[in-house]
């Protein structure tokens, strides 16, 4: 009984990407943090749901902080050191996610707000009556 040898079993090499972009999409219900290279290829991402939060707790600043930490930890493995942050949305996790990225050792060079503003487009949802 001969043992079969695997031919061409090569280890996948990781690309070192020192500079990139961080996209923070902060809605009222969730926050999604995506770290990419300068071309837009995704290096790492995390959301409040993947950080272990469910339901209305996903919309909190603490959940956004934990999601940004998780994404930064994944991106640090591929050598990401410096990012430009692009923030989109009105959610409460905007500032918390940026502060968490800075605290996790990633150098933030610029912060841009790219929230889309309608020129009187779609009708907004009706007011809540509680």
Curated annotation (Swiss-Prot):
GO terms for biological process: translation. One of its GO terms (cellular component) is ribosome. Pfam families: Ribosomal_S11. The keyword rRNA-binding applies. Keywords: Ribonucleoprotein, Ribosomal protein, RNA-binding, rRNA-binding. One of its GO terms (molecular function) is rRNA binding. Part of the 30S ribosomal subunit. Interacts with proteins S7 and S18. Binds to IF-3. Located on the platform of the 30S subunit, it bridges several disparate RNA helices of the 16S rRNA. Forms part of the Shine-Dalgarno cleft in the 70S ribosome. NCBIfam families: PRK05309.1 (NF003698), uS11_bact (TIGR03632). This is Small ribosomal subunit protein uS11. The lineage of its organism: Bacteria, Bacillati, Chloroflexota, Dehalococcoidia, Dehalococcoidales. The gene is rpsK.
């Amino acid at each position: 009984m001969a043992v079969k040898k695997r031919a061409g079993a090569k280890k996948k090499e990781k690309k070192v990407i020192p500079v990139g972009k961080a996209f923070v999409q902060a809605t009222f219900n969730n926050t999604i943090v995506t770290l990419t290279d300068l071309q837009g290829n995704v290096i790492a991402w995390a959301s409040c749901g993947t950080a272990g939060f469910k339901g209305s707790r996903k919309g909190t600043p603490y959940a956004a902080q934990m999601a940004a930490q998780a994404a930064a930890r994944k991106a640090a493995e591929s050598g990401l050191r410096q990012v430009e942050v692009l923030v989109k949305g009105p959610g409460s996790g905007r500032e918390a996610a940026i502060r968490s990225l800075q605290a996790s050792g990633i150098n933030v060079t610029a912060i841009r707000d790219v929230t889309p503003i309608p020129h009187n487009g779609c009708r907004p949802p009706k007011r809540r009556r509680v």
